[in-house]
Amino acid sequence: MAIDMKAIHDSTHTLVMGVLNITEDSSSDGGLWLDPAKAKAHGEAMMKAGADIIDIGAESTRPGAKRVSEEDEQTRVLGAVDALISEGAVLSIDTTRASVARMALEHGAQIINDVSGGRMDREVPHVVAEHAESLYIVQHWRGWLAGSAGDVPDADTSVYANGVVDDVYDELMKQVDDVLQAGVSPSQIIIDPGLGFSKPSVEHNFPLMVALERFNATGYPVLIGASRKRFVGAALADAGIDEPDMDSKDNATAAISALCAEHGAWAVRVHDVEKSRDAVAIGNAWRAFAND
């Protein structure tokens, strides 16, 4: 099945990216899809539920998570890529390693989702540049504690002297400049403000989502990844919902998905595809009539 990546990149409606964590320790679903057969079945189920893209990650980025070996990450990713590419899936690979990115692209993956935005392994942008038809998600990133795959800061990286929106915008644009210098084409780039990464609170994350149109104005498509993050649960708790469970967080994520679709996000990255699929459909319709 031929994939029109230009159409994926330049979509006029918000896409749904389903999360496939083939990890032992992801915060919400660690261990559930580690078995290759279960990973394939879950990926296929998300496609059937309406996911436009499947985002495969073999290393947890939760706070405090320990890194998996390069060999283990490669093995997990390759198994999932080979299993799903034959089903016509558009595959995004959540990795910070150049070796994993190269292997996945050579086996048919189309998107590299680098939560470090090219900072953890400086070769990743070069690998993307070598694959001119691929896309590269550049996420805002302030650094991790050595030896950890999660956003555990060396110092207090959650302080934004000029306000979270201005600082994240400026820092993310600097990351984009560095990626361009590495040879990545502007047409390959998607940006992500990195919700939850060095942004622990409601006060950090909601202003970034409210400022979505400012990020859209860069001309780069924008990915929003709010699904099941702690600030979503905190917002529910602030509204008087005690100890919100996963279903509550998925409902809240769907509300965020609808709002982000209405305001022109390129895609939303979610765990519960079905709920956000319906929410995004309403947001897309709202946007279409608002712009009519």
Regions from the language model: what does each represent?
Residues 3-5, 10-11, 27-41, 61-79, ...:
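Active-site-adjacent loop and "lid" segments of alpha/beta metabolic enzymes
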Residues 185-188:
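Short acidic capping loops at alpha-helix termini that bridge into adjacent secondary structure
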Residues 41-57, 263:
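Catalytic domains of carbohydrate-active enzymes, especially glycoside hydrolases
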